[in-house]
Amino acid sequence: MYMATPKRQRAGAVLVLHSWWGLNDFFRRLCDRFADQGFVALAPDLYDGRVAVTVAEAQALRATVTASRKEPAYKYLMRMIVELRGAAAVDDIGVVGCSMGGHWAYWLAQRPDLPIVATVTFYAARDGDYSQSRSSFLAHFAEADEWVSTAGIKRLHRSLTKAGRAFEFHTYPGTGHWFFEDDRADAFQPEAAVLAWRRTLDFLKQRMG
């Protein structure tokens, strides 16, 4: 795991969930950026220190780690939530997840026993029962995404609407999957990333302030 703590007054606590590349430098820097804004940020390491660079490596790594984990990923994530709450001395937290991490963020946010009041996802959609969720949602989508279907986004929209949850969806023109991750040279879109970051901070501060 990686944790970053603010030097000034704290704004809250954020669990940062990495994409299928693993806990790489981008997600460590993302934690640092949250800390600069006053948040205690903790990024669990779902791959036990291993990272991937190519899609093929990521697919293989995810499959290998999933099959070999001694502690199920969901139990590990819930344990990390306990650790984050203790480190930040807070009751409620926010969750931010990219791609695979976004799927985990939605799964966690559905659980009424978890202290999640704000959920932010990048290029991820997961249908489910959100009727017992305590969270509000902010979802960032790419305009052209080969990994997230329009149908999947519509299903998520229906699920959140049916559950009466507060949510915002934003789609960024001219972007594809991983547009927020500045280490993905083939996908990173600086202008969209800046706008998504600003919206993310505003959302978290409003929900956790």
For each feature predicted by the language model, list its residue ranges.
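A conserved short beta-strand
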Residues: 114-124
